[in-house]
Amino acid sequence: SSSKMRYVYVDINGDHIDELITEPGYGYLTQAIYSYKNRTVKTVAAVGQGTFTKYYPKHKVIYIKNSGHMGYLCDYYYKQSKTGVYKLVAQVGKDYGSRSYDSKPIKTTYYIGNKKTSKAKYSQYIKKMLKGEKGKNFSSLKWKRY
């Protein structure tokens, strides 16, 4: 039945240990990523109102495109910290107001950390962080249901 949760095991951070990604499908928790280390399961990343888009194992980065609702969408970059948890390092806020999402946003705001920045500085930061790594699509993983 369609009420079964989707999940997949994949090594998203290049440490040769698979993480578990689940898709509970709630508005506040669309997808979550769990790691297993020292016999402990830990939530390392979660997304509400959207889905994980790409992961960059070499640079331990996760990208989420178009997360949000009510006319405001964000693109997020998370980088894995020393604790294993992914921390938000950069984001773009796109305000559509009452426009449809296929038109251009009324206003776009760029952030590195929690500081506003220019589009050029944001792009430069992302480029430097990923160093040309192509990234892999979460959508092309072999999802299962249980």
Regions found by a protein language model. Name each.
Residues 1-2, 40-52, 90:
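Blade-edge motifs of beta-propeller repeat domains
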